[in-house]
């Protein structure tokens, strides 16, 4: 028996290796570096890893898509795929991860009130215990979050590029497990944070079971877990369509959990509310990109032969997601829960682009993900800066109740104005990136014959504008309630990381709304999947 040595295309793996290598190096830094230098070293390493990954992705794009001599293909013995959609998803993830790490690194200006990061000084301590109190007084800083974030980003880079379903599952676990931990590390409201972590873990395990069951059925149908071979089996196999449809529905359901689509959205409001706010922004933006990248590959590569069987399922999920997300967002009184249900509604709008089943649908989904992700990270970055101040003048938890945002436009007009920009983008108001994202997604759906979904999407967008405008009215045209002993609202001064992140995301929201053509043209090249 002759053993054939597998050929590994190291250049194609460069973005993933950069991020995972930096994550491993971050673990070694935690073990051996002096405590005083860990934070600056970890922040620098994480930012360089995200920037380096984006540079490697840009290089691979030039080689594979830009005519540099390469071609879209499967790599690492078919375990991964290097094609336009995979590189587009990876590039967006790298951009959002860089901005998200900037927000995670924020700890307030030294000596100013609230000059602490968002993470518990000792994650393993019992909330309110003497151990936690001693860790807080000692000024301990949880720098393990940076390698955890990088491990999650590494899984996200693999997820949309997976060439077989086992690689897809492993990538799902690699991106999810760090997020389960990070969700329970909030410095403030520790019990709520730990509850969010437990709910996310339990429901995530349930979704993983659905995904695995779907993989098992698809393997039984095709005799392979390779996505390309399953596609080939759909063209040749007859008499087993029931097995294929059930397997696809279960597999897609597992992916829809990560997207936050109805009825797989139950974790979203609780986790978004309880997790550290910077992690919420990172998770809401980056996880969505990775999950939609994988969903597009499954729907466009495996499911085309079963379009008439799968499309009704996706249509129902899209309608429910848009309607339920919008209606429940309207009745929320907590800012983070409002943005959580807004995220659910946006998942529905993105699904409208997915069901277009056309190249324009693919490029529109990626543009929407970029626009939504940038605005989301910026919005949660500002939520983390708006805090409560008690009667003694101590700055405490985030001012997450909507009533606490009343009059913010007078106290901090810059913060309120930029936050209003993000809200207008979420609402799809012209001259913002959110408008262009919705427009191209809905246009692709109309061309694909899904005009009823577009009608529902337009009506849901109009209804969603109510709660976005309500927050803007609160900030600029409502006086804050003054109750004796009630905490006031203040905006903590940024150390600089959040200021840079907000400046980048706000500028991108405007530029992509006014001049989206270069990005749309670039993404139009990333619409062909390798089978």
Curated annotation (Swiss-Prot):
Swiss-Prot/TrEMBL keywords: Cell membrane, Membrane, NAD, Quinone, Translocase, Transmembrane, Transmembrane helix, Transport
GO molecular function, one term: NADH dehydrogenase (ubiquinone) activity
Keyword Transport: yes
Protein biosynthesis among keywords: no
EC number: 7.1.1.-
The protein's role, per its UniProt record: NDH-1 shuttles electrons from NADH, via FMN and iron-sulfur (Fe-S) centers, to quinones in the respiratory chain. The immediate electron acceptor for the enzyme in this species is believed to be a menaquinone. Couples the redox reaction to proton translocation (for every two electrons transferred, four hydrogen ions are translocated across the cytoplasmic membrane), and thus conserves the redox energy in a proton gradient.
Family: Belongs to the complex I subunit 2 family.
Protein name listed in UniProt: NADH-quinone oxidoreductase subunit N
Highest classification ranks of the organism: Bacteria, Bacillati, Actinomycetota, Actinomycetes, Micrococcales
